[in-house]
Swiss-Prot record:
HAMAP family noted in UniProt: UDG
Sorted UniProt keywords: DNA damage, DNA repair, Host nucleus, Hydrolase
Enzyme class: hydrolase
Lineage: Viruses, Duplodnaviria, Heunggongvirae, Peploviricota, Herviviricetes
Organism: Gallid herpesvirus 2 (strain Chicken/Md5/ATCC VR-987) (GaHV-2)
GO biological process: base-excision repair, AP site formation via deaminated base removal
Biased composition regions of type Polar residues, renumbered to the chain: 56-68
The protein's name: Uracil-DNA glycosylase
Protein's job: Excises uracil residues from the DNA which can arise as a result of misincorporation of dUMP residues by DNA polymerase or deamination of cytosines. Therefore may reduce deleterious uracil incorporation into the viral genome, particularly in terminally differentiated cells which lack DNA repair enzymes.
InterPro entries per the UniProt record, alphabetical: UDG_fam1, Ura-DNA_Glyclase_AS, Uracil-DNA_glycosylase-like, Uracil-DNA_glycosylase-like_sf
Catalytic reactions of this protein: Hydrolyzes single-stranded DNA or mismatched double-stranded DNA and polynucleotides, releasing free uracil
Compartment(s) of residence: Host nucleus
Length: 313
């Protein structure tokens, strides 16, 4: 291509002409030879990873399409979010918690958290199952909560997490952290009947809210869902709960749990207890934790009645 004569042009005009000249050179480049193959695009394998087990139950193509549509509808535009009834039915949330949970779930932040969970659940095996993420709402109403035990995130091994912090269903081996918790209960109440299982549903029915600061986890990857945003939701729920129900004992176990609730200087209606996480890896042995007795001493003093820490019906 012939050289261009740019004499007499302004600097701006020279830039424009120069750009056009470069573009013309691109167009003039010879095409690929007929026998020269086009470079192949790299594509990732279609579908979920090998061995993936869906937490959604129905894995048919039509179910996937409906699932993706429901994710997209969670955040429709800047401010449109799903109504309470749809969210409550989708996650099996008890109606008793509507007043506390509706403002946190039926808003932009809440819809973003749920949408991020749903997005991950397409390609990850997530615990607990979707219908158990809010299982903690199904055992006692907010006004009946006497104690809140806050942990980190659910167990990441198959068959363990079922929506109650630290708890496992009957028949499942008791995890090390829960063993330490039960040892601490025994130290406070030697006569407590703890049976031979790790299911803490009996505590939940007696007003103990067993809540993780992060409500979901990827299989085999503890801490993997910290960026979903559950912590914002949990902090706000505990703040609302503390403002509507008097005389609650907050047991915050571990550094992460201790960021979920901050007692204000003027709020002496509640008791806040802090201790290291019950994991065997913690520096401080959890078996010496006296929170269970301290909780009952406080509840008895304010007339709310002690908690039976046994695991019998």
């Amino acid at each position: 291509m012939a050289q261009l004569d740019l004499t007499g042009l302004t600097e701006t005009s020279k830039m424009i002409v120069g750009e056009c000249h470069v573009e013309l050179k691109r167009c003039a480049e010879p095409p690929l030879a007929a026998d020269e193959p086009m470079p192949k695009k790299c594509r990732r394998p279609a579908g979920p990873p090998k061995g993936f087990i869906s937490t959604r139950g129905d894995t048919s193509p039509s179910s996937d399409n409906n699932h993706i549509h429901s994710i997209q509808s969670l955040t429709n535009g800047d401010s449109c979010v799903q109504p309470w009834d749809i969210i409550a039915n989708a996650y099996n949330i008890h109606e008793n918690w509507k007043q506390l949970l509706l403002p946190e779930l039926c808003c932009l932040r809440g819809s973003e958290i749920l949408a991020e969970y749903e997005r991950r659940a397409i390609t990850e095996e997530v615990y607990p199952p979707k219908m158990d993420i809010f299982a903690w709402t199904r055992y006692c109403a907010p006004e009946s909560v006497k104690a809140v035990i806050v942990g980190q995130d659910p167990y990441a091994n198959p068959g363990q997490a079922h929506g109650l912090a630290f708890s496992v269903k009957q028949g499942v081996a008791i995890p090390p952290s829960l063993k330490n918790i039960l040892l601490a209960v025994k130290a406070c109440y030697p006569s407590a009947d703890l049976g031979n299982h790790g299911c803490l549903e009996a505590w939940s029915k007696r007003g103990v809210l067993l809540l993780n600061s992060v409500l979901t986890v990827k299989r085999g990857d503890p801490g993997s869902h910290h960026s979903v945003g559950w912590q914002f939701f949990i902090r706000n729920i505990l703040r609302r709960l503390s403002s509507t129900t008097r005389g609650i004992v907050f047991m915050l176990w571990g550094a992460q749990a201790q960021t979920m609730y901050f007692q204000t200087d003027y709020d002496d209606r509640h008791l806040v207890l802090k201790y290291s996480h019950p994991s065997p890896l913690s520096r401080k042995p959890f078996a010496t934790c006296t929170h269970f007795k301290e909780a009952n001493d406080f509840l008895s003093k304010i007339g709310r009645g002690c908690i039976d820490w046994s695991l019998t019906a």
